[in-house]
Amino acid sequence: MGYSKRFALYISILILIVMVAGCGKSDETKEDSKEEQIKKSFAKTLDMYPIKNLEDLYDKEGYRDGEFKKGDKGTWVLYSAIVSQPKGESLKSRGMILKLDRNKRTAKGSYIIRELKEDKNHDVQKNEKKYPVKLVNNRIVLVKDVKDKKLKNEIESFELFSQYGNFNHFDRNEITNISYNPNAPNYSAEYKMKKNDRNIQQLKKRFNLKTSKTPKLLFKGSGDIKGSSVGYKEIEIIFSRSKEEAFIMLTALSSFQVTK
């Protein structure tokens, strides 16, 4: 399998985890062009960051439509993962998905470690390990004990990007490469980050990234731009993505109904 197909497959696997509705309430008008709607959606998604106390989401209402059952407050889904592939190595990711049920006021999820590599026949082999976690007093707690002390500390000290990501400097006028496919429907837009961006420094420090490249911010979504009960909105901070190497931060912050 070629590099581009392999990487696309891997990203699609991650996206399947967060195929839920976009966050926040819509304020787009009928007069807005699709390009303007995408810009607004991009800005609104980034405006959610940071959420230092994740338990605040229990009292925050996300997107709602006619699919929600009466009385269902919904569930927030947060996902963050660093995807890396240093030159000559396999594709790996380490990250967490956390679901905050606003009805039960409980939060459960998993810390997930994945690796994709090609065998001698160029078939992709996937290795995955999941470690159940829960949120207690805004702290990540392992549901089952992990004997590896280094891994245990890594999991319990992990912070989702939504907790420390900060886009108060974001300029909507600098959004470029906006695309929209009405048949899917899906859409995307890019934002060139600056070298002194605090988010870049945070990611390099937290994940020991050794790249000097300035990343771009890629906003991707599917479904109605204004929000829907099916679809997703995702942010990728791409340091590099080529045949030689890949360093990408994936993050999603979305809300959806508990039952249909």
From Swiss-Prot:
Lipid-linked residues (N-palmitoyl cysteine): C23
Major subcellular site: membrane
PROSITE patterns: PROKAR_LIPOPROTEIN
Protein name (record): Uncharacterized lipoprotein SA0401
InterPro entries: Csa, Csa_sf
A cellular component term, taken from the record's GO annotations: plasma membrane
Stretch forming the signal peptide: 1-22
Family according to the record: Belongs to the staphylococcal tandem lipoprotein family.
Lipidation (S-diacylglycerol cysteine): C23
Organism, scientific name: Staphylococcus aureus (strain N315)
